């Protein structure tokens, strides 16, 4: 996919949602129950590790409440999902990323919206 960027200087920071993107959207009332482990969407762990090996910064975002951080971190660890930061409590509404264009006119932000529960396994940046 042509992003109109200089491929030689590609240095991505990836903001990626959890529920419905990395693992299947589950029942919000079940998330905090002891032993609950979300179902990982096929290709998730491999894609995250690929991005990490390329030096991309991986920032996970979720509408889950901050009070669920400990259980969420355990779920991520159990699933083998590595990341640089975890941003909790951003709510369930639409997300808007605002970023400037580079001086040469190249884009500095892109959006990908896979269908819920289809995951990121086939995503090529």
Task: List where the protein language model places each region.
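HAD-like aspartate-dependent phosphatase fold
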Residues: 1-125
